[in-house]
């Protein structure tokens, strides 16, 4: 048997959380760095995670009547200036194409940072009657935003996402769409990713550039920092006025259409890593894992062990994403490798176990090992996966709830903030929010639909108007 180098370990979360995170991204072979700074290569294992998210969300959106489309990567710069608030929000990050070969372009082309402009321009040409509504379009694509500081999956100059763009006849219909998408995202987190989210409305300073209202899903990472994992925006008739998206209603009146836009991105993969993983490497929930089960024969040269392994693989691959590892490497090396890659379930097959018609199963998320009869094993997998997924969700939910506090004074707020997690406080408005951000680095995550904690704002001593959840965030 070949002598193999031991699988490289990752940094610990307590010693260096940032290095621990990038170690997992690189050593679990999710990504590689490219030659262009701020751009990553999605390796097969990492891209498969995104594909599984796509499949799940596509299935849901098809049931709700949404259709997938693809719009161009670029649009003329002149369109960028049609909606002032939108351009103010995105122009600092917008990348432009100015030359082709040695020639300057007669008109600069903007590489999409988001696609509200492209969709609005199209809708203005194609929507004329109430019979054309609603339009429920979704796009899977890449976008480019020239970020100064980058981190794999969380913040990059290019990232992958889905962006929905819908058009409706009334405000009520558009708002219903905005909130229903928020529910879909929350369900995606719970059912596929085992991620609990805090959901709510964004403050005026944190809302999307060009939106009337923004809602977001927020996840809490293991280090106590928040991560905005997705957003859903009610755009009102702002873009409709800028791009003249009008329709003839059933009463023969010309009206502006109401729009929404919404999206989740590969940030969800970053959230998966930071919430579930441990000091041994990646930990993945079973339903999203690219490789759900790995079968490891302990004696690869033994014919009976090999035969049972191949038979079991043949049975399991009909319903699961399963891999049979027949490489000429030590079992210990393989164990470490698949633990690093976060494979939810490992099956160890050896001569001693076969004497009792048993295999050993290992669950990655809690390191539990048990022997089980070969004939009983396939029928028990659904329950194993369900328990595994639910336990991972509950663990993440417990972490979120234990790190969610409320403050009645500014000093108490600062103390809680240093401990990490979410801190709720009733504030007077934007003035208090900006002061908090400047003095503590915490940002408003969502507005809570709860009673005021205090009558006056602890920061400004003015009358408190709303209770806001704050955190330091990625």
Swiss-Prot record:
- What Pfam families does the database record attribute to this sequence? HGTP_anticodon, ProRS-C_1, tRNA-synt_2b
What is the enzyme's class at the highest EC level?
ligase
Source superkingdom? Bacteria
Could you say which EC number(s) this protein's record lists?
Answer: 6.1.1.15
Q: Which PROSITE patterns match?
A: AA_TRNA_LIGASE_II (PS50862)
InterPro entries recorded for this chain? Answer: aa-tRNA-synt_IIb (IPR002314), aa-tRNA-synth_II (IPR006195), aa-tRNA-synth_II/BPL/LPL (IPR045864), Anticodon-bd (IPR004154), Anticodon-bd_dom_sf (IPR036621), Pro-tRNA-ligase_IIa (IPR002316), Pro-tRNA-ligase_IIa_arc-type (IPR004499), Pro-tRNA_ligase_II_C (IPR016061)
> Which GO terms of the cellular component aspect does the record hold?
aminoacyl-tRNA synthetase multienzyme complex; cytoplasm
What's this protein's family per the entry?
Belongs to the class-II aminoacyl-tRNA synthetase family. ProS type 3 subfamily.
Q: How does it assemble?
A: Homodimer.
Task: Name the chain's protein.
Answer: Proline--tRNA ligase
User: What species does this protein belong to?
Assistant: Aster yellows witches'-broom phytoplasma (strain AYWB)
High-level lineage: Bacteria, Bacillati, Mycoplasmatota, Mollicutes, Acholeplasmatales
Q: Which gene encodes it?
A: proS
């Amino acid at each position: 048997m070949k002598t193999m180098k031991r699988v490289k370990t990752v940094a610990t979360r307590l010693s260096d959380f940032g290095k621990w995170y990038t170690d997992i991204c690189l050593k679990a072979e999710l990504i590689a760095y490219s030659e262009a700074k701020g751009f990553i290569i999605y390796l097969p294992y990492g891209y498969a995670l995104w594909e599984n998210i796509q499949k799940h969300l596509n299935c849901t959106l098809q049931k709700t009547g949404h259709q997938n489309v693809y719009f161009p990567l670029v649009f003329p710069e002149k369109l960028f200036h049609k909606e002032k608030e939108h351009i103010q929000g995105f122009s600092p990050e917008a990348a432009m194409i100015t030359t082709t070969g040695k020639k300057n372009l007669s008109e600069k082309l903007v590489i999409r940072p988001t696609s509200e402009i492209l969709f609005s321009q199209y809708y203005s040409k194609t929507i004329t009657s109430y019979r054309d509504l609603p339009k429920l379009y979704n796009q899977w694509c890449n976008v480019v935003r020239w970020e100064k500081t980058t981190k794999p999956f969380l913040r990059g100059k290019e990232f992958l996402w889905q962006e929905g763009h819908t058009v409706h006849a009334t405000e009520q219909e558009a708002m219903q769409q905005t909130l229903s998408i928020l529910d879909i995202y929350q369900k995606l987190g719970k059912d596929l990713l085992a991620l609990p989210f805090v959901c709510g409305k964004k403050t005026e300073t944190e809302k999307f550039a060009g939106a009337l209202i923004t809602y977001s899903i927020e996840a809490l990472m293991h280090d106590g920092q928040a991560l905005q994992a997705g957003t859903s925006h009610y755009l009102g008739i702002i873009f409709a006025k800028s791009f003249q998206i009008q329709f003839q209603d059933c009463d023969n009146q010309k009206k502006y259409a109401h729009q929404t836009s919404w999206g989740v991105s590969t940030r969800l993969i970053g959230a998966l890593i930071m919430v579930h993983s441990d000091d041994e490497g990646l930990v993945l929930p079973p339903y999203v894992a690219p490789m759900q089960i790995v079968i490891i024969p302990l004696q690869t040269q033994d014919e009976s062990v090999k035969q049972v392994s191949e038979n079991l693989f043949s049975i399991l691959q009909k319903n699961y994403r399963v891999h049979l590892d027949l490489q000429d490497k030590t079992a210990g090396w393989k164990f470490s490798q698949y633990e690093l890659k976060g494979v939810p379930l490992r099956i160890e097959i050896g001569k001693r176990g076969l004497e009792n018609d048993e295999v050993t199963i290992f669950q990655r998320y809690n390191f539990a090992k048990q022997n089980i009869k070969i004939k009983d094993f396939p029928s028990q997998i659904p329950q194993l996966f369900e328990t595994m997924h639910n336990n991972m969700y509950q663990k993440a939910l417990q972490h979120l709830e234990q790190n969610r506090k409320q403050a009645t004074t500014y000093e108490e707020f600062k103390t809680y903030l240093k401990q990490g997690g979410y801190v709720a406080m009733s504030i007077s408005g934007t003035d208090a929010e900006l002061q908090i951000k400047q003095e503590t680095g915490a940002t408003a995550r969502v507005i809570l639909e709860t009673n005021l904690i205090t009558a006056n704002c602890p920061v400004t001593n003015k009358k408190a108007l709303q209770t806001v959840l704050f955190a330091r965030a990625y």
